[in-house]
């Protein structure tokens, strides 16, 4: 059943409109410098993140695994991550715990030298859901499976509310994270609805190392699950998905809130290198791309490479036009915030 759901998620994300109605990165404007006083060829896009060096401040965000079609996608993404020295996450690894025969759909990334590898498990699986929660041995298995540097714990409770088979219990998640943080380097990750500053602080107090905001702007899993419910003829879940299609904290606002608390991966609706530059300017350490790369990854390494090369070029152009020689200078660049994002930034 999990494998079928993974396949459905991939095909829906590729073929349906599952984006939020507004991309809030369009409300961020970087200040242009007519005389940048920078040599484009000397611009340094390298960055250090939690003790690891990357050639470019980009994460291939967690997307897939647990289905045969995911194996090729993860292999292609890992090949590109090695080539351009990018961080990479895999999709939820619950499938590998339930069915070990699916493990190679994740471990395939070990065939490439990815500088930062991020394992992945859902926050709902950390607490009982009518059955026992996964234990530390299960998490150690998936962590070791891809020789991970970090464990992403993804918070997808909106998705769970729309899923026909969704989990309903969130009580005790922070407690479990605190227990696990002594054994694993944890990154808290949303899946399209963002984190508030208060939640970020609770996670920091529980020992989380960083946050991937994955806020409202790009793919919304309420929409993904709306289409699954539609295909299954589940009118109740369709209505919930439609009602909460645009639920969440805008990605740029979530970056702004959380960057005072923990290192942040800005994600949720990033489409190009300019969006990435905007995320860095708001306080993100890295930017995460997912659906932007998915169709290419389903085709070939070359297709993903072309996309990543364009993202990097656009990012450098944005750095040049704002007069910044390195990523650390970009974080201080002047910006203008437009409506409706401005209201969120003032909360």
Swiss-Prot record:
<keyword id="KW-0521">NADP</keyword>
<feature type="binding site">
    <location>
        <begin position="62"/>
        <end position="64"/>
    </location>
    <ligand>
        <name>FMN</name>
    </ligand>
</feature>
<protein>
    <recommendedName>
        <fullName>Isopentenyl-diphosphate delta-isomerase</fullName>
        <ecNumber>5.3.3.2</ecNumber>
    </recommendedName>
</protein>
<dbReference type="InterPro" id="IPR011179">
    <property type="entry name" value="IPdP_isomerase"/>
</dbReference>
<dbReference type="GO" id="GO:0004452">
    <property type="term" value="F:isopentenyl-diphosphate delta-isomerase activity"/>
</dbReference>
<dbReference type="Pfam" id="PF01070">
    <property type="entry name" value="FMN_dh"/>
</dbReference>
<feature type="binding site">
    <location>
        <position position="160"/>
    </location>
    <ligand>
        <name>Mg(2+)</name>
    </ligand>
</feature>
<feature type="binding site">
    <location>
        <position position="159"/>
    </location>
    <ligand>
        <name>substrate</name>
    </ligand>
</feature>
<feature type="binding site">
    <location>
        <position position="120"/>
    </location>
    <ligand>
        <name>FMN</name>
    </ligand>
</feature>
<keyword id="KW-0963">Cytoplasm</keyword>
<dbReference type="InterPro" id="IPR013785">
    <property type="entry name" value="Aldolase_TIM"/>
</dbReference>
<feature type="binding site">
    <location>
        <begin position="269"/>
        <end position="271"/>
    </location>
    <ligand>
        <name>FMN</name>
    </ligand>
</feature>
<feature type="binding site">
    <location>
        <position position="189"/>
    </location>
    <ligand>
        <name>FMN</name>
    </ligand>
</feature>
<feature type="binding site">
    <location>
        <begin position="5"/>
        <end position="6"/>
    </location>
    <ligand>
        <name>substrate</name>
    </ligand>
</feature>
<keyword id="KW-0460">Magnesium</keyword>
<dbReference type="GO" id="GO:0008299">
    <property type="term" value="P:isoprenoid biosynthetic process"/>
</dbReference>
<keyword id="KW-0285">Flavoprotein</keyword>
<dbReference type="GO" id="GO:0070402">
    <property type="term" value="F:NADPH binding"/>
</dbReference>
<feature type="binding site">
    <location>
        <begin position="290"/>
        <end position="291"/>
    </location>
    <ligand>
        <name>FMN</name>
    </ligand>
</feature>
<dbReference type="GO" id="GO:0010181">
    <property type="term" value="F:FMN binding"/>
</dbReference>
<keyword id="KW-0288">FMN</keyword>
<comment type="function">
    <text>Involved in the biosynthesis of isoprenoids. Catalyzes the 1,3-allylic rearrangement of the homoallylic substrate isopentenyl (IPP) to its allylic isomer, dimethylallyl diphosphate (DMAPP).</text>
</comment>
<feature type="binding site">
    <location>
        <position position="219"/>
    </location>
    <ligand>
        <name>FMN</name>
    </ligand>
</feature>
<keyword id="KW-0479">Metal-binding</keyword>
<keyword id="KW-0413">Isomerase</keyword>
<dbReference type="GO" id="GO:0005737">
    <property type="term" value="C:cytoplasm"/>
</dbReference>
<comment type="subunit">
    <text>Homooctamer. Dimer of tetramers.</text>
</comment>
<feature type="binding site">
    <location>
        <position position="92"/>
    </location>
    <ligand>
        <name>FMN</name>
    </ligand>
</feature>
<feature type="binding site">
    <location>
        <position position="214"/>
    </location>
    <ligand>
        <name>FMN</name>
    </ligand>
</feature>
<keyword id="KW-0414">Isoprene biosynthesis</keyword>
<dbReference type="GO" id="GO:0000287">
    <property type="term" value="F:magnesium ion binding"/>
</dbReference>
<dbReference type="GO" id="GO:0016491">
    <property type="term" value="F:oxidoreductase activity"/>
</dbReference>
<comment type="similarity">
    <text>Belongs to the IPP isomerase type 2 family.</text>
</comment>
<feature type="binding site">
    <location>
        <begin position="92"/>
        <end position="94"/>
    </location>
    <ligand>
        <name>substrate</name>
    </ligand>
</feature>
<feature type="binding site">
    <location>
        <position position="61"/>
    </location>
    <ligand>
        <name>FMN</name>
    </ligand>
</feature>
<dbReference type="InterPro" id="IPR000262">
    <property type="entry name" value="FMN-dep_DH"/>
</dbReference>
